[in-house]
Amino acid sequence: MARIETLYFIHHSHTDIGYTHDQPIVFDLHERFITQALTLAERSADSDSDGAFRWTVENTYVLLCWLQHASPREIERFQAMEKAGRIEVTGMFANLTPLLDVGQLAETLQPLRTLRDDYGFTITSAMNCDVNGESWSLPDLLLDAGIEGFTMAINTHFGGAPLARPDVFHWQAPSGRTLLAYSGWPYDQGWRYGVGRSAEDFEQVWWPRVMARLDAIDYSLPVVMVQSFHPFGDNGSAFADFVAWIDAWNASGKSPRIKFATPRQWWAAVKPHAQQLPVYSGDWTDYWNFGCGSSAREQTINRQSRARLRNADAFGAAGLATAAAADPWLARTFALYRTEAWDNLHFWDEHTWGADI
Protein backbone atom coordinates (compact mmCIF):
# COMPACT_ATOMS: atom_id res chain seq x y z
CA MET A 1 0.00 0.00 0.00
CA ALA A 2 1.35 3.42 -0.99
CA ARG A 3 2.32 5.73 1.86
CA ILE A 4 3.13 9.24 0.72
CA GLU A 5 4.97 11.39 3.22
CA THR A 6 5.50 14.47 1.04
CA LEU A 7 3.72 15.87 -1.99
CA TYR A 8 6.12 18.04 -3.99
CA PHE A 9 4.26 20.94 -5.58
CA ILE A 10 5.87 22.64 -8.59
CA HIS A 11 4.43 25.93 -9.83
CA HIS A 12 5.11 27.35 -13.28
CA SER A 13 3.42 29.05 -16.18
CA HIS A 14 2.63 26.80 -19.11
CA THR A 15 4.19 28.31 -22.22
CA ASP A 16 1.77 27.69 -25.09
CA ILE A 17 2.95 29.88 -27.95
CA GLY A 18 0.04 31.21 -30.01
CA TYR A 19 -2.63 29.18 -28.21
CA THR A 20 -4.33 31.73 -25.97
CA HIS A 21 -2.89 34.85 -27.63
CA ASP A 22 -0.88 35.74 -30.70
CA GLN A 23 2.78 34.84 -30.41
CA PRO A 24 4.21 38.33 -29.69
CA ILE A 25 1.65 38.82 -26.93
CA VAL A 26 2.54 35.45 -25.39
CA PHE A 27 6.22 36.39 -25.24
CA ASP A 28 5.39 39.77 -23.68
CA LEU A 29 3.11 38.14 -21.11
CA HIS A 30 5.75 35.64 -20.05
CA GLU A 31 8.25 38.41 -19.47
CA ARG A 32 5.72 40.01 -17.13
CA PHE A 33 5.12 36.68 -15.40
CA ILE A 34 8.82 36.24 -14.68
CA THR A 35 8.96 39.71 -13.11
CA GLN A 36 5.89 38.93 -11.02
CA ALA A 37 7.31 35.56 -9.92
CA LEU A 38 10.56 37.28 -8.97
CA THR A 39 8.68 39.68 -6.70
CA LEU A 40 6.77 36.81 -5.06
CA ALA A 41 9.98 34.83 -4.55
CA GLU A 42 11.59 37.82 -2.84
CA ARG A 43 8.55 38.18 -0.60
CA SER A 44 9.19 34.66 0.75
CA ALA A 45 12.98 34.88 0.64
CA ASP A 46 13.45 34.88 4.42
CA SER A 47 10.94 32.10 5.07
CA ASP A 48 12.06 28.53 5.73
CA SER A 49 8.46 27.29 5.50
CA ASP A 50 7.62 24.44 3.13
CA GLY A 51 4.98 26.80 1.75
CA ALA A 52 7.43 29.54 0.80
CA PHE A 53 6.94 30.61 -2.81
CA ARG A 54 9.10 28.99 -5.45
CA TRP A 55 8.93 29.39 -9.19
CA THR A 56 10.03 27.17 -12.04
CA VAL A 57 10.90 28.60 -15.45
CA GLU A 58 9.39 26.02 -17.79
CA ASN A 59 11.29 27.00 -20.97
CA THR A 60 14.51 28.83 -21.77
CA TYR A 61 13.28 30.94 -24.70
CA VAL A 62 10.95 33.14 -22.65
CA LEU A 63 13.70 33.63 -20.06
CA LEU A 64 16.12 34.72 -22.79
CA CYS A 65 13.52 37.27 -23.91
CA TRP A 66 13.21 38.55 -20.35
CA LEU A 67 16.98 38.78 -19.88
CA GLN A 68 17.25 40.76 -23.11
CA HIS A 69 14.83 43.42 -21.84
CA ALA A 70 15.38 43.37 -18.07
CA SER A 71 17.41 46.03 -16.31
CA PRO A 72 20.77 45.12 -14.73
CA ARG A 73 19.15 45.42 -11.30
CA GLU A 74 16.31 43.07 -12.25
CA ILE A 75 18.82 40.52 -13.54
CA GLU A 76 20.78 40.75 -10.28
CA ARG A 77 17.59 40.14 -8.32
CA PHE A 78 16.74 37.13 -10.47
CA GLN A 79 20.25 35.72 -10.06
CA ALA A 80 19.98 36.09 -6.28
CA MET A 81 16.67 34.21 -6.12
CA GLU A 82 17.95 31.51 -8.49
CA LYS A 83 21.08 31.05 -6.39
CA ALA A 84 18.94 30.82 -3.24
CA GLY A 85 16.84 28.05 -4.79
CA ARG A 86 13.66 30.13 -4.88
CA ILE A 87 13.61 30.13 -8.68
CA GLU A 88 14.81 27.32 -10.92
CA VAL A 89 15.62 27.53 -14.61
CA THR A 90 14.93 24.33 -16.53
CA GLY A 91 16.60 23.26 -19.74
CA MET A 92 14.10 22.85 -22.59
CA PHE A 93 13.81 25.63 -25.19
CA ALA A 94 10.03 25.15 -25.48
CA ASN A 95 7.48 22.36 -25.26
CA LEU A 96 8.65 20.43 -28.29
CA THR A 97 7.08 17.75 -30.44
CA PRO A 98 9.08 14.73 -31.66
CA LEU A 99 9.38 16.39 -35.09
CA LEU A 100 12.87 17.62 -34.22
CA ASP A 101 15.76 15.44 -35.32
CA VAL A 102 18.94 14.96 -33.30
CA GLY A 103 20.71 17.99 -34.71
CA GLN A 104 17.76 20.30 -34.18
CA LEU A 105 17.23 19.05 -30.63
CA ALA A 106 20.88 19.81 -29.95
CA GLU A 107 20.33 23.33 -31.29
CA THR A 108 17.51 23.89 -28.79
CA LEU A 109 19.91 23.16 -25.93
CA GLN A 110 22.51 25.73 -27.01
CA PRO A 111 21.03 28.50 -24.80
CA LEU A 112 22.12 26.52 -21.73
CA ARG A 113 25.71 27.60 -22.34
CA THR A 114 24.73 31.27 -22.29
CA LEU A 115 22.50 30.90 -19.25
CA ARG A 116 25.21 29.09 -17.30
CA ASP A 117 28.31 30.96 -18.44
CA ASP A 118 26.93 34.49 -18.69
CA TYR A 119 24.42 34.44 -15.84
CA GLY A 120 25.67 31.71 -13.51
CA PHE A 121 22.45 29.68 -13.44
CA THR A 122 22.49 26.07 -12.25
CA ILE A 123 20.47 24.05 -14.77
CA THR A 124 20.13 20.35 -13.96
CA SER A 125 16.45 19.68 -14.72
CA ALA A 126 14.33 19.71 -17.86
CA MET A 127 10.59 19.54 -18.32
CA ASN A 128 8.08 19.34 -21.13
CA CYS A 129 4.35 19.81 -20.70
CA ASP A 130 1.30 19.08 -22.85
CA VAL A 131 3.22 17.14 -25.51
CA ASN A 132 2.82 13.37 -25.35
CA GLY A 133 6.20 12.08 -26.43
CA GLU A 134 9.83 12.68 -27.32
CA SER A 135 12.31 10.92 -29.57
CA TRP A 136 14.84 8.48 -28.17
CA SER A 137 17.73 10.83 -28.94
CA LEU A 138 16.60 13.25 -26.23
CA PRO A 139 18.00 11.50 -23.11
CA ASP A 140 21.52 11.34 -24.54
CA LEU A 141 21.36 15.01 -25.51
CA LEU A 142 20.05 16.03 -22.10
CA LEU A 143 22.75 14.04 -20.32
CA ASP A 144 25.40 15.63 -22.54
CA ALA A 145 23.93 19.02 -21.62
CA GLY A 146 24.30 18.35 -17.88
CA ILE A 147 20.64 17.53 -17.20
CA GLU A 148 20.02 15.00 -14.41
CA GLY A 149 16.21 14.71 -14.40
CA PHE A 150 13.44 15.09 -16.98
CA THR A 151 9.71 15.41 -16.30
CA MET A 152 6.75 15.05 -18.66
CA ALA A 153 3.27 16.38 -17.82
CA ILE A 154 1.25 14.81 -20.62
CA ASN A 155 -2.10 16.15 -21.81
CA THR A 156 -4.36 13.17 -22.40
CA HIS A 157 -6.96 15.11 -24.43
CA PHE A 158 -6.80 12.93 -27.57
CA GLY A 159 -3.55 11.59 -26.16
CA GLY A 160 -2.06 9.25 -23.64
CA ALA A 161 0.93 8.26 -21.59
CA PRO A 162 2.86 5.10 -22.47
CA LEU A 163 3.27 4.11 -18.81
CA ALA A 164 0.95 3.92 -15.82
CA ARG A 165 1.47 7.36 -14.37
CA PRO A 166 2.69 8.75 -12.14
CA ASP A 167 5.86 6.80 -12.73
CA VAL A 168 9.48 7.49 -11.83
CA PHE A 169 12.07 5.55 -13.81
CA HIS A 170 15.42 5.52 -15.55
CA TRP A 171 15.11 6.35 -19.24
CA GLN A 172 17.89 4.42 -20.95
CA ALA A 173 19.38 6.31 -23.89
CA PRO A 174 20.81 4.77 -27.10
CA SER A 175 24.27 5.13 -25.52
CA GLY A 176 23.23 2.88 -22.63
CA ARG A 177 23.33 5.73 -20.13
CA THR A 178 20.22 6.47 -18.08
CA LEU A 179 18.38 9.67 -17.25
CA LEU A 180 16.02 10.02 -14.30
CA ALA A 181 12.53 10.60 -15.68
CA TYR A 182 9.06 11.24 -14.30
CA SER A 183 5.83 10.68 -16.19
CA GLY A 184 3.52 12.78 -14.07
CA TRP A 185 0.01 14.15 -14.07
CA PRO A 186 -1.05 17.01 -16.37
CA TYR A 187 0.54 20.32 -15.49
CA ASP A 188 -2.77 21.81 -14.24
CA GLN A 189 -3.50 19.05 -11.77
CA GLY A 190 -2.43 20.71 -8.53
CA TRP A 191 -5.14 23.35 -8.79
CA ARG A 192 -7.69 20.81 -9.93
CA TYR A 193 -6.87 18.67 -6.88
CA GLY A 194 -7.80 21.64 -4.69
CA VAL A 195 -4.35 23.02 -3.83
CA GLY A 196 -4.77 26.77 -3.42
CA ARG A 197 -8.53 26.40 -3.84
CA SER A 198 -10.30 24.02 -1.44
CA ALA A 199 -8.80 22.06 1.44
CA GLU A 200 -12.06 20.13 1.71
CA ASP A 201 -11.90 19.00 -1.93
CA PHE A 202 -8.26 18.07 -1.57
CA GLU A 203 -8.73 16.09 1.64
CA GLN A 204 -12.07 14.40 1.01
CA VAL A 205 -12.20 13.96 -2.76
CA TRP A 206 -8.92 14.25 -4.59
CA TRP A 207 -6.30 12.93 -2.22
CA PRO A 208 -8.23 9.66 -1.60
CA ARG A 209 -8.43 9.25 -5.39
CA VAL A 210 -4.70 9.88 -5.72
CA MET A 211 -3.92 7.30 -3.06
CA ALA A 212 -6.24 4.76 -4.69
CA ARG A 213 -4.43 5.33 -7.97
CA LEU A 214 -1.01 4.95 -6.37
CA ASP A 215 -2.12 1.71 -4.72
CA ALA A 216 -3.48 0.41 -8.01
CA ILE A 217 -0.16 0.90 -9.80
CA ASP A 218 2.00 -0.25 -6.83
CA TYR A 219 3.71 3.12 -6.52
CA SER A 220 6.54 2.52 -4.07
CA LEU A 221 8.16 5.89 -3.32
CA PRO A 222 7.28 7.95 -0.21
CA VAL A 223 7.22 11.11 -2.34
CA VAL A 224 5.19 12.13 -5.36
CA MET A 225 5.09 15.30 -7.44
CA VAL A 226 2.30 17.38 -8.92
CA GLN A 227 2.55 20.53 -11.02
CA SER A 228 0.22 23.50 -11.24
CA PHE A 229 -0.24 26.63 -13.27
CA HIS A 230 -2.31 29.74 -12.48
CA PRO A 231 -6.09 29.10 -12.36
CA PHE A 232 -6.39 31.29 -15.47
CA GLY A 233 -4.91 28.45 -17.49
CA ASP A 234 -2.22 28.28 -20.15
CA ASN A 235 0.03 31.33 -20.42
CA GLY A 236 -1.04 32.37 -16.94
CA SER A 237 0.91 34.28 -14.32
CA ALA A 238 2.26 33.27 -10.93
CA PHE A 239 -0.39 32.57 -8.28
CA ALA A 240 0.41 34.01 -4.85
CA ASP A 241 -2.45 32.26 -3.02
CA PHE A 242 -0.69 28.89 -3.12
CA VAL A 243 1.62 30.09 -0.31
CA ALA A 244 -0.99 30.71 2.39
CA TRP A 245 -2.97 27.62 1.38
CA ILE A 246 0.03 25.28 1.68
CA ASP A 247 1.11 26.85 4.97
CA ALA A 248 -2.40 26.38 6.39
CA TRP A 249 -2.58 22.78 5.20
CA ASN A 250 0.78 21.90 6.72
CA ALA A 251 -0.15 23.65 9.98
CA SER A 252 -3.20 21.38 10.25
CA GLY A 253 -0.90 18.37 10.62
CA LYS A 254 -2.82 16.41 8.02
CA SER A 255 -1.18 14.07 5.55
CA PRO A 256 0.54 14.48 3.20
CA ARG A 257 2.93 17.28 3.95
CA ILE A 258 3.06 19.58 0.93
CA LYS A 259 6.32 21.18 -0.12
CA PHE A 260 6.32 24.13 -2.50
CA ALA A 261 9.30 23.04 -4.58
CA THR A 262 11.30 23.27 -7.76
CA PRO A 263 12.32 20.29 -9.92
CA ARG A 264 15.79 20.16 -8.38
CA GLN A 265 14.27 19.61 -4.93
CA TRP A 266 11.99 16.94 -6.33
CA TRP A 267 14.89 15.05 -7.87
CA ALA A 268 16.88 15.36 -4.65
CA ALA A 269 14.01 13.56 -2.90
CA VAL A 270 13.92 10.86 -5.59
CA LYS A 271 17.64 10.09 -5.79
CA PRO A 272 17.87 8.14 -2.50
CA HIS A 273 15.40 5.67 -4.06
CA ALA A 274 17.06 5.53 -7.48
CA GLN A 275 18.27 1.94 -7.09
CA GLN A 276 14.72 0.60 -6.91
CA LEU A 277 13.45 2.40 -10.02
CA PRO A 278 12.70 0.48 -13.23
CA VAL A 279 14.64 1.05 -16.46
CA TYR A 280 12.81 1.72 -19.74
CA SER A 281 14.38 2.10 -23.16
CA GLY A 282 13.21 3.48 -26.50
CA ASP A 283 11.13 6.33 -27.90
CA TRP A 284 8.69 8.06 -25.59
CA THR A 285 5.66 7.30 -27.75
CA ASP A 286 3.85 10.34 -29.14
CA TYR A 287 0.07 10.10 -29.38
CA TRP A 288 -0.71 13.71 -29.99
CA ASN A 289 1.12 15.53 -32.78
CA PHE A 290 -1.84 16.77 -34.80
CA GLY A 291 0.21 19.41 -36.55
CA CYS A 292 1.97 17.05 -38.93
CA GLY A 293 -1.21 15.88 -40.56
CA SER A 294 -3.13 19.15 -40.42
CA SER A 295 -0.45 21.16 -42.23
CA ALA A 296 1.57 18.69 -44.28
CA ARG A 297 2.64 21.25 -46.89
CA GLU A 298 3.96 23.68 -44.29
CA GLN A 299 5.64 20.83 -42.45
CA THR A 300 7.46 19.93 -45.67
CA ILE A 301 8.65 23.52 -46.05
CA ASN A 302 9.95 23.49 -42.48
CA ARG A 303 11.87 20.27 -43.10
CA GLN A 304 13.36 21.75 -46.26
CA SER A 305 14.31 24.88 -44.34
CA ARG A 306 16.15 22.75 -41.80
CA ALA A 307 18.28 21.24 -44.57
CA ARG A 308 18.97 24.71 -46.00
CA LEU A 309 20.05 26.01 -42.60
CA ARG A 310 22.56 23.19 -42.33
CA ASN A 311 23.91 24.10 -45.75
CA ALA A 312 24.13 27.71 -44.60
CA ASP A 313 26.17 26.58 -41.59
CA ALA A 314 28.61 24.82 -43.90
CA PHE A 315 28.94 27.82 -46.23
CA GLY A 316 29.25 30.21 -43.31
CA ALA A 317 32.01 28.16 -41.69
CA ALA A 318 33.84 27.92 -45.01
CA GLY A 319 33.55 31.67 -45.57
CA LEU A 320 34.91 32.49 -42.13
CA ALA A 321 37.74 29.98 -42.48
CA THR A 322 38.88 31.19 -45.91
CA ALA A 323 38.47 34.94 -45.46
CA ALA A 324 41.63 36.84 -46.35
CA ALA A 325 41.38 38.82 -43.12
CA ALA A 326 39.38 38.49 -39.94
CA ASP A 327 35.97 40.08 -40.40
CA PRO A 328 34.11 40.47 -37.09
CA TRP A 329 31.01 41.77 -38.88
CA LEU A 330 30.74 38.63 -40.99
CA ALA A 331 30.70 36.39 -37.92
CA ARG A 332 28.40 38.72 -35.99
CA THR A 333 25.85 39.07 -38.79
CA PHE A 334 25.86 35.35 -39.53
CA ALA A 335 25.27 34.53 -35.85
CA LEU A 336 22.43 37.06 -35.62
CA TYR A 337 20.44 35.73 -38.55
CA ARG A 338 21.35 32.13 -37.80
CA THR A 339 19.80 32.33 -34.33
CA GLU A 340 16.63 33.95 -35.65
CA ALA A 341 16.27 31.35 -38.40
CA TRP A 342 16.75 28.38 -36.08
CA ASP A 343 14.36 29.87 -33.52
CA ASN A 344 11.66 30.14 -36.19
CA LEU A 345 12.32 26.54 -37.18
CA HIS A 346 11.91 25.45 -33.54
CA PHE A 347 8.69 27.43 -33.18
CA TRP A 348 7.11 25.55 -36.06
CA ASP A 349 7.94 22.24 -34.37
CA GLU A 350 6.71 23.55 -31.01
CA HIS A 351 3.51 22.01 -29.72
CA THR A 352 -0.23 22.58 -30.10
CA TRP A 353 -1.51 23.25 -33.55
CA GLY A 354 -3.98 21.50 -35.79
CA ALA A 355 -6.01 19.90 -32.98
CA ASP A 356 -9.79 19.50 -32.83
CA ILE A 357 -10.45 20.20 -36.50
State what each model feature region is.
Residues 1-357:
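Catalytic-domain carbohydrate-binding cleft regions of carbohydrate-active enzymes
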